[in-house]
Swiss-Prot record:
It is found in: Cell membrane; Vacuole membrane. This is ABC transporter C family member 4. One of its GO terms (cellular component) is Golgi apparatus. It comes from Arabidopsis thaliana (Mouse-ear cress). It is a multi-pass membrane protein. GO terms for molecular function: ABC-type xenobiotic transporter activity; ATP binding; ATP hydrolysis activity; ATPase-coupled transmembrane transporter activity. ATP 2 binds at G1308, R1309, T1310, G1311, S1312, G1313, K1314, S1315. It catalyses: ATP + H2O + xenobioticSide 1 = ADP + phosphate + xenobioticSide 2. Its EC number is 7.6.2.2. Induction: By salicylic acid (SA), menadione and, to a lower extent, by 1-chloro-2,4-dinitrobenzene (CDNB), benoxacor, cloquintocet, fenchlorazol and fluorazol. It is an enzyme of class 7 (translocase).
Amino acid sequence: MWLLSSSPWLSELSCSYSAVVEHTSSVPVPIQWLRFVLLSPCPQRALFSAVDFIFLLCFALHKLFSSPSSSSEINGHAEIRKPLIGIRGRTPTRTTAWFKTTVAVTVLLSFCSVVLCVLAFTGKRRTQRPWNLIDPLFWLIHAVTHLVIAVLVLHQKRFAALNHPLSLRIYWISSFVLTSLFAVTGIFHFLSDAATSLRAEDVASFFSFPLTAFLLIASVRGITGLVTAETNSPTKPSDAVSVEKSDNVSLYASASVFSKTFWLWMNPLLSKGYKSPLTLEQVPTLSPEHKAERLALLFESSWPKPSENSSHPIRTTLLRCFWKEILFTAILAIVRLGVMYVGPVLIQSFVDFTSGKRSSPWQGYYLVLILLVAKFVEVLTTHQFNFDSQKLGMLIRSTLITALYKKGLKLTGSARQNHGVGQIVNYMAVDAQQLSDMMLQLHAIWLMPLQVTVALVLLYGSLGASVITAVIGLTGVFVFILLGTQRNNGYQFSLMGNRDSRMKATNEMLNYMRVIKFQAWENHFNKRILKFRDMEFGWLSKFLYSIAGNIIVLWSTPVLISALTFATALALGVKLDAGTVFTTTTIFKILQEPIRTFPQSMISLSQAMISLGRLDSYMMSKELSEDAVERALGCDGNTAVEVRDGSFSWDDEDNEPALSDINFKVKKGELTAIVGTVGSGKSSLLASVLGEMHRISGQVRVCGSTGYVAQTSWIENGTVQDNILFGLPMVREKYNKVLNVCSLEKDLQMMEFGDKTEIGERGINLSGGQKQRIQLARAVYQECDVYLLDDVFSAVDAHTGSDIFKKCVRGALKGKTVLLVTHQVDFLHNVDCILVMRDGKIVESGKYDELVSSGLDFGELVAAHETSMELVEAGADSAAVATSPRTPTSPHASSPRTSMESPHLSDLNDEHIKSFLGSHIVEDGSKLIKEEERETGQVSLGVYKQYCTEAYGWWGIVLVLFFSLTWQGSLMASDYWLAYETSAKNAISFDASVFILGYVIIALVSIVLVSIRSYYVTHLGLKTAQIFFRQILNSILHAPMSFFDTTPSGRILSRASTDQTNVDILIPFMLGLVVSMYTTLLSIFIVTCQYAWPTAFFVIPLGWLNIWYRNYYLASSRELTRMDSITKAPIIHHFSESIAGVMTIRSFRKQELFRQENVKRVNDNLRMDFHNNGSNEWLGFRLELVGSWVLCISALFMVLLPSNVIRPENVGLSLSYGLSLNSVLFFAIYMSCFVENKMVSVERIKQFTDIPSESEWERKETLPPSNWPFHGNVHLEDLKVRYRPNTPLVLKGITLDIKGGEKVGVVGRTGSGKSTLIQVLFRLVEPSGGKIIIDGIDISTLGLHDLRSRFGIIPQEPVLFEGTVRSNIDPTEQYSDEEIWKSLERCQLKDVVATKPEKLDSLVVDNGENWSVGQRQLLCLGRVMLKRSRLLFLDEATASVDSQTDAVIQKIIREDFASCTIISIAHRIPTVMDGDRVLVIDAGKAKEFDSPARLLERPSLFAALVQEYALRSAGI
């Protein structure tokens, strides 16, 4: 090779023209000049001397111009940390291992330079030419420089310097580059024909190289390693303190450089994991510098200022935060690139050595030693690069999640709707992860051209001009890959968009599963999600088949380009021997890495750019304006809330006001009620006071802190106590008082764990009234100045509402400013002021009597209420008579009792009635949300079997193995053919055409086999992924309601997103790669042991060591991966929960509390990720080191074995395979571990495919007649219900008959079991005993859809799905537009919908948030009116509408459902007064069941309830 020639420039110090240019050489002159400048001793010494001189000059000038005054302290301690300044004062310091190592390295370099200087001056010189003085002078300057640096570093402790000076850092970087050139020159000189022994300067350069590499790292880090008393840390004051105080901080925080270099800090954790499965508590916390709270501050401080007008703020900020880490990984990548080509270059030397062309008997051992050192440096830099890149990715993900969360708490309402909760969750779960993963691929983009250039230069030395064919071939491959990348970019973009849509639909389905089951809409949502999935699957298939095409090109490139290059070389007359051929094939194999990683890097880059764009869009979304409301904690004067000339809109971009001409003033301590019809703007008015709406004009002023109770309850997943305290400390006396005034004491008494009872997701195990009272208690406990209560009485019964109004609103909150939105006219004469709203304007305001006399809007509301109360008051009069003292001659005393008749007054004593009026029961008080189950130990073979055989059984596995083995066999055949044709004994009969023809045929067979294999693996993966998706979707839809009550949606969503993505893409790809790696590893062992057979004796124990390492590592890694998955779900859940309750959080100013909780959850997750990455590189370093030892042992035996035993061509073949042993061995074992960790996703999906299902949806053998129910007769016989085994009964033996067409009202205290009765009639909860017979059919014998689809229901909480008015009122598309309009007209919404431009296609956002709660309830009524069921259930259906609208709805129901059986749960007594019968439920028992009139004639519980409802206003 031309680099190993005996040219004089390689060994002489002459800088003459003759030493540079050899006119007889075939090497071009520019290349000779480049070679001379970089690798010749003369310019090297000149460059190094210049660098030394410049540094010494800078040092001298700095000392010269440092005045004595600079030694004094400036601003306290400002100058104490500046090095090179003579500070006389002493500061207490502590040295770390980093400082000590730096000192040791500088002293060693100084010693080495001094020794070489002495040798240069005392050594014998052959001639007295002038340039012979270059060497001694160079070493003299070099020795002086290193001595100065050693003294400087030692004096840093005296001056308490925390950072190295910039001049020193620049010098160390330059020194590393130049020392690298010295070392390369030394290697080439040793390998050259003229070399007889190693020179002293060559040995010195080999010795100095790792030392300067350490100083390079020191220059990038910048810190000296000294810790002063002021800081206690080289980075942050708080870091060291936190390390000392924490008992279980990651050992990385305090690890020495040596420990970090070889991942020794991971040993204790891996040891624990090997002995027993790791638990969450055993995994150490993150180092302080890696914690989310520190990174969040760094991100905020680096965010571009508005004046910068940055169009890509995320990218800019991340670069500012992590440029040092990016630079350090880039340096590692360059060092790795520098040593990875040493092996291919040495192949020719090994072949020459075994051929007898040796300059020294020791040359073989030197070659083995160089190979060992080069592989060691390659392995170390590779895994340090991987670890630091993954750590950087982890830091970026942590930074982004906390930033996204903080932004979520600031978004305006319209911005929140534009992005949607599902998409925002994807920003955290997908886009942040995408940018994190990108860090491992980042440097491959610019390293690829450099790596290819180096390879081509080396190839040019071996093959000359024929390398042009390789350039053309590689260019063609790159063009194909680039076009494929561009195509994949489009596929990936569409795939992510469709995945977002599927996740959004899945999230919506999970949130409203109760309504879906009530309406028997599972099939509709199944089709809807499958429609999204089919679109996603189409893009997924295109994406994966395109990737498979890229893989085929990548795997085929070495043989294809080799064939073209060898053909060109023979055509040009280049002699091909074993050394040249196998050096070439090895270089092409090395080029596989940039060819493989470049397209993947481009894909990752394109995905990252898409993600950056999405995140930029989100982070630049509008935030709530801080000046929308003028806030003051202490205000002079009497005004607490004031709005002047206010106009407000929900849309930031639209100036069409939702509220206009708003003018009102509330004095301190006043109770102001806000009333109006449905959709008049009452809730919006409260939002405007809170600053939640876009202020178009006007002024809002609020004095003091605010507390908000939303109309739709927002409850956190946690304990009752946590929800009430809401971040404040427990004050028991105050806490108990709050429980009392919010009527929660008896509820808590009935709960198994009292206020420690865990509340399910979205308060699923609480009644509507209990949720409302808990969030009211939360507000009262906060002791705010201004309270905004949005319809807090709608979800509670009359007695509870009266109690809360008296004890809470007029009691505990007396003296506070309260704005109360209410439909309860009864309370209005006890308020200080009333605001009446219509169409977004305040049309009236004043006191009760003033407004009634005006006869306008308020008068209509009061009139409607009084009309509805007439029946109640008449009943109350009867009740008063019934409950008056009676004589034994009273005619009522002898009236016969029905089976359900109430007991007489003698039985219903005062305590009994009081107990009933104040009783509450919780339906289930035990711990509801279960800890997520996780498998421990090895992933079972059953999971692998289920995945691999799901598509085509065992035949799928057999075919993959067959094609993999035959493909690898064809690759081996091509290399055996090269070895045979280039052997010495075949040289005489060598036929170029036969050589090329044979190689091309083998190459084509290899390409065909790898194509079949790749496409088949892709097909298997896609088919399996779709099967798994359909299985889990089907399982979830068939799951009983109890499953959703006890399983947070975050757990299901994590399986539908992260786990499904793993099954879609990662697992099939990686599983195919594992098979390829193991077949490649098998081929390497066969070839290596075939020609260096003694190596087999070492392979067996080293192979056992590999297996032991794998099992030792996997025991911990598997659990860390599982815990990583488990700790991800709480981040998602907490985020979506926070977005849902953001108005409540903001009103109480609790953003910081929730941000800290987010930070805590992020840290919990990232510590798993960090230690998992550490364990991966711990394993990788050791495995690759073992592979390198096997290679070097094999090379040593090739040197030791006589030439008649091992032929040169076999040496080339063996080394070309052996050089990739370390990386293939690592990737084979690492990928198998990676696959096992990712197989946890299959395991997790499998958990949810085995959920116990509810009963069949349809039963053909018991299909009811099409017109069933015929009459609506309902018979309950000893009905008993409990929610889960071993829990108390909720309904305790109810027996009753309801005749067809009867209107039955169900009343009872909050949590008494009313809603449970409806659930059991729909079989959302199966009876624990008894029967339910409807029109002669036992409903337990019917299919669930056959049952539920025949009933109509308006649920307690109105639910709208994202879509349009049409898709919400008729989701199954069974009715015509005419029928829909008629239904909307009957439910009072026709005018509202008709005024919208899109009419029936008007937008409904997630949960119908662009419609008022009352309008949502009316739309739900419209659904039922279309259905026209014979049996109708109303679960507090009019709780959120005013009395006027309630009266209209009741009238509609009476007219449209006159012949239907109606079972209505109601808190408003007027809604049941005109019913046929009333069912009174108390503590799960049917206490009374009779007509309202008969119940009022005697001292019944119902009579007491009616009387209390009628008189509650008077008593307030």
